[in-house]
Amino acid sequence: VRCGIQADIVEEGTTTMPVRRLSSIVRELPDAAIEISVDDSDVATLDCGSSFFKIVGLSAEEFPVVSSPEDKFCYQLDQGTFSEMLQRTAYAASTDETRYVLNGVLLSFKEAKLTMVATDGRRLALIENEVDFPDEAASEMILPSKAVQELIHVLGDEGELRIYSKENQIIFEFGNV
């Protein structure tokens, strides 16, 4: 998940930090400005009021490269519609680790419609919605259950959702996320 926020940047740079640790710290901080500084060994220091934390991160070069959305096919939908489609299919996805190919929701962009399908071998959920996209953008992909649940959690009820896909990567872009 990549999210943009307003910040006063003194010196540009990149690093990575464990998201669970960072979010649990930020969640408990008072509603005030947070100052983040990172040293050469990727140790981040967070200052907020009287609170002070250090988080050991990794170099950004060790993080997997996510290509930019511009070189991918783009599908545009309403966030609420996409979220509802996910909710109506996610329940049927398998949780059996030995059947990993069923541990998600199939997204099929074909014939001017988006079809979502999930099954655990006993239950089957299918939902379709018309979507405009060029014929060369037709594709299918399995969205892992964990990603499905995260999208259901963060998507809003309204607003535009842009889905970029190419080969084995998919990017969901909405608002500042």
What are these model-derived regions, one by one?
Residues 1-177:
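Structural preference for solvent-exposed beta-strand-turn elements
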